[in-house]
């Protein structure tokens, strides 16, 4: 199987699994919104803001470190060095995961009562502490399988973890001991801990099986310096991640406090916070499943190109990734602008959720493009620049939340989110464009997609109004309308020349590799020698 096809196949597996996981997760958030209401979701979101800081400390950058070092060693066909890196990563995860568990368990009363100002969060934090060691091991296994392009294994583990979490949560919420907001938070924490533990056990078993299979035919090569290289990648990422996670935790703690200082009641402040973070943002992040799957695979792919010094392959892959991301994000942004109220009503039976979704629709192109740019920077060994930008962005967000929320309320926070993404993206994209010479075409990447999206939404809205006897903006009809708009959007892009023939041929060639062989343009009257410069150029063109 060709390299590009393998990359696309792994990305498709990741995309489908990520789509399934986000769909299940969004359905579960809908269930929680109806079960424990917005203020209950807000309380658990506060718990998760502190837990995310503990998760950052438990992982300590080991996922990316494992992916980079293992991918580089497999690219050099040095299997013993890859296994040495894996063993070092497991020891690293055991240390930081155990330390994070002890710290979170012991500091839970202080964090819950002093930081979150709510004693109901303490039992949930203590229970979540036991999920940190298995989570750290799962990060190592995930990084290893990502480096080996075994996307389906990470997909299976993700689906298993999500299904276990939801099954435990639903079962516990039905018991009388877990009624009320504190009981609901405790049930969700227990479900997350059980899911992480079960998933880690399966990950380790599969990892052992994988290592035994490789040992049969692996040559013995030098593996010195692997642990030092792993620490060189992981520790700086960990240190910067600590700072950013701490700033994000402070930001999330300040949001309900700022809303209360603006005049809102405590329950109303938790409800507004829960609506934005527990309802609206999952909807915005749901389409990102398609891109995040390929973004995860960009890291090892670009890492191998970077080690070999193949600048042309890096430029082509980055250019195509940016193009597809912008096209997709503009379509999703238009969907949210047009159907925000309907989505809020159908999913959550909440008009306020629809209004927040409309206000944050402009966040979609910024967030999606920033996500793919960050992945490319990590693959090109520019992760420190990316983390530096994230820290600056998080610090500015904390200051803005502290200063603006008490005066302007929740509207200020929505604008802070948009401004934060714009600032972060401008720094990250400028860094990427300095490292990789990508040709930017504003008409093809910005103007035409926006016009085609507006045209597609206008046409489908006009047609649906003529067929209002058969269609409405409720239930499945709403999603049919959204699907028709998206299909028409890409059709208009093709008609306007935004999507070119070469793009269509490239996509079809991924599914039908024989198609390129039958094309007479790909054949040469006189085949060049296999070692010649012309042959290498031809092979490189066919691969991309």
Model-derived regions: residue spans:
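Interfacial segments at transmembrane-helix termini and the short loops linking adjacent helices
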Residues: 109-128, 335-367, 371
């Amino acid at each position: 199987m060709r390299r590009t096809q393998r990359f696309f196949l792994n990305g498709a597996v990741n995309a489908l699994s990520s789509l399934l996981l986000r769909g299940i997760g969004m359905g579960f958030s809908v269930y929680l919104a109806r079960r424990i209401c917005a203020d209950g979701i807000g309380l658990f979101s506060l718990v998760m803001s502190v837990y995310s800081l503990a998760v950052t400390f438990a992982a300590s950058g080991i996922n990316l470190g494992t992916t980079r070092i293992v991918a580089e060693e497999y690219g050099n066909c040095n299997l013993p060095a890859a296994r040495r890196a894996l063993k070092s990563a497991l020891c690293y995860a055991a240390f930081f995961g155990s330390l994070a568990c002890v710290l979170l368990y012991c500091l839970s009363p202080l964090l819950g009562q002093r930081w979150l100002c709510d004693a109901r969060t303490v039992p949930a934090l203590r229970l979540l502490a036991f999920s940190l060691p298995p989570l750290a091991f799962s990060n190592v296994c995930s990084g290893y399988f990502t480096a080996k392009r075994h996307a389906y294994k990470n997909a299976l583990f993700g689906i298993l973890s999500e299904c276990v979490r939801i099954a435990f949560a639903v079962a516990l919420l039905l018991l009388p001991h877990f009624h009320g907001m504190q009981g609901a938070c405790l049930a969700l924490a227990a479900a997350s801990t059980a899911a992480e533990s079960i998933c880690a056990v399966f990950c380790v078993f599969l990892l052992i099986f994988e290592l035994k299979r490789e040992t049969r035919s692996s040559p013995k090569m030098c593996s010195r310096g692997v642990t030092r290289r792993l620490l060189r990648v992981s520790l700086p990422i960990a240190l910067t991640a600590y700072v950013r996670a701490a700033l994000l935790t402070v930001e999330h703690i300040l949001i309900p406090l700022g809303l209360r200082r603006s005049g809102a009641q405590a329950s109303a402040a938790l409800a507004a916070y829960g609506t934005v973070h527990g309802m609206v943002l999952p909807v915005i992040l749901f389409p990102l499943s398609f891109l995040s799957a390929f973004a995860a695979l960009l890291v090892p792919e670009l890492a191998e190109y970077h080690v070999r010094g193949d600048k042309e392959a890096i430029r082509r892959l980055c250019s195509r990734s940016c193009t597809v991301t912008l096209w997709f994000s503009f379509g999703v942004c238009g969907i949210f602008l047009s159907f925000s109220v309907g989505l809020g009503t159908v999913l959550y039976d909440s008009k306020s959720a629809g209004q927040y979704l409309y206000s944050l629709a402009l966040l979609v192109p910024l967030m999606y493009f920033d996500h793919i740019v960050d992945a490319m920077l990590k693959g090109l060994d520019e992760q420190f620049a990316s983390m530096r930008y994230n820290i600056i962005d998080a610090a500015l967000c904390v200051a803005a939340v502290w200063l603006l929320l008490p005066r302007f309320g929740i509207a200020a926070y929505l604008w802070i989110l948009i401004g934060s993404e714009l600032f972060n993206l401008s720094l990250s994209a400028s860094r990427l464009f300095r490292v990789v010479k990508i040709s930017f075409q504003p008409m093809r990447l910005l103007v035409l997609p926006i016009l085609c999206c507006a045209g597609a939404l206008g046409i489908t809205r006009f047609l649906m109004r003529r067929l209002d006897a058969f269609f409405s903006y409720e239930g499945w009809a709403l999603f049919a309308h959204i699907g028709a708009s998206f299909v028409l959007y890409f059709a208009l892009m093709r008609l306007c020349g935004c999507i070119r023939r070469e793009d269509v041929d490239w996509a079809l060639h991924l599914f039908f590799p024989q198609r390129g062989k039958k094309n007479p343009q790909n054949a040469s009257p006189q085949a060049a020698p296999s070692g010649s410069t012309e042959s290498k150029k031809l092979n490189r063109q066919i691969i991309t």
